[in-house]
Every structure is written in C-alpha cells, then in structure tokens.
A protein has these predicted regions:
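Charged, low-complexity, helix/coiled-coil-prone segments
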Residues: 1-11, 61-71, 93-105
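Post-cleavage N-terminal segment of exported redox proteins
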Residues: 1-48, 162-167, 188-202
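Electron-transfer interface patches adjacent to heme c in soluble/periplasmic c-type cytochromes
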Residues: 13-22, 80-184
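A generic secondary-structure signal for well-formed alpha-helical elements
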Residues: 30-37, 62-66, 71, 75, ...
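Sequence context of c-type cytochrome heme-c attachment sites
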Residues: 32-43, 50-53, 69, 85-91, ...
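Electrostatic cytochrome c docking/interface patches
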Residues: 36-60, 72-79, 104, 174-177, ...
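The canonical Cys-X-X-Cys-His
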Residues: 55, 61-70, 120, 187, ...
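Surface-exposed patches in mature extracellular/periplasmic domains of secreted proteins
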Residues: 67, 133-138, 198-202
Length: 202
C-alpha cells in the first residue's frame, strides 16, 4: 500500500490507527488483568480502619494528592530516598488510587511510621514550625473539626462492594470508632499506615 493513498484518505488512516492501537492494547494491557501480581493484595495488606478511611477522604478533600505522589518508581534515586518501590498489590483496595503525578512535596508511599504522630500533627498544623522552607499550606482547622461518623459505615459498605474484605463487625462499629475524633486524628492515622504492608529497608 502506498503512503500517498493513506495520506489522502483520512478515513482509512484513522481506521488503521484505531486498529493499531487496539492490537497494542489487547497485547499489552489485557494480559495484566489476568496476572495475580497486578490484582492480588500483597501479603499482610489490611483494609483501612474506619478512622484511616475517614483520614483518606480528608486527604482527598484537602487536595493533598495534588502535591504528593504515592508511588515510588523503581529507580535507584527514588528507592534510596523513599524506600522499596511501589507494587500494584499495595493499591488493589484503593478506590480511587492516589498515585498522583506531581511532587511539589515528597512522595508519601512509605511515610507510615517514618515520623511520630506528634511530628505529623505539628507539620499539618503549621508546616513551617517543623520544616522552615516548606511550601505546604497549614491545616489548623483539622484540629477543630470533629468527625461524627454518620457516613463511615456506608463508605465501608461501598468499599466492600469493590472487594475490600470488611466484615459486618467492622461496618457495625465504624461510627463508634470515629465519633468524637478530630479530622487531624483521622489524617494522621491514614498517613501512619501508608506503605507499612511491605517490609521497607532503606
């Protein structure tokens, strides 16, 4: 087939492009759905507790994913700084996943347990009190806002529909688990669990 025919016939060119992309998708993407390594949770992965789940929602609400990624790429510079590279099995229960694509701030995929709860609270309340050159905004209202847990059980039921193994007991006790806690408690609980399902050697 001569290139001139393709160049003059946009419809034919578009059809062949769609065909090429479809074949590429079928051969590269579809097999991933059938590999256990991409859709099975890593050993030791536990569902978020009610408080951690609320913290995750606050993380999303406050736009943290706009400045922090949660995916360490398998490059030496990243693994030396952040720890073990991210694997798909860590994120199978994250709906939506929060890998992110921008790093105004550091990657948080392995931040769990790296700093104390008190450090995290101080940093979220006013980052410049802890890191003077920080560009991160302060979140003082997280200390004042209380959780009532009104929708926590419903959130867990929805997540169970996505295949996350929440038990009836988890769901029944969800409201009591978060009631009276602050949004700061919740987001710190969420941050402290990130990346803890994989043995992290730096």
């Amino acid at each position: 087939m001569k290139h001139e025919i393709l160049e003059k016939n946009i419809g034919l060119m578009a059809l062949l492009m769609v065909l090429a992309v479809s074949i590429g998708g079928l051969t590269q993407i579809v097999p991933l759905f059938f590999q256990d390594v991409t859709n099975e949770p890593v050993e030791g992965l536990k569902p978020y507790t009610a408080l951690q789940l609320e913290g995750r929602d606050i993380y999303i609400r406050e736009g943290c994913v706009g400045c922090h990624s949660q995916m360490i790429r398998p490059f030496r510079a990243e693994t030396e700084r952040y720890g073990h590279y991210s694997v798909a099995g860590e994120s199978v229960w994250d709906h939506p996943f929060l890998w992110g694509s921008k790093r105004t701030g550091p990657d948080l995929a392995r931040v769990g347990g790296r700093y104390s709860d008190e450090w995290q609270r101080a940093h979220l309340y006013n980052p410049r009190n802890v890191v003077p050159e920080s560009k991160m905004p302060a979140y003082p209202w997280l200390v004042e806002n209380k959780l009532d847990g009104k929708y926590t059980a419903k959130k867990m039921e929805v997540m169970r529909g996505f295949g996350i193994p929440y038990t009836d007991e988890d769901i029944a006790g969800a409201q009591d688990a978060v009631k009276g806690k602050t949004e700061m408690d919740a987001i710190v609980a969420y941050l402290q669990v990130l990346g803890t399902s994989i043995k992290n050697k730096r």
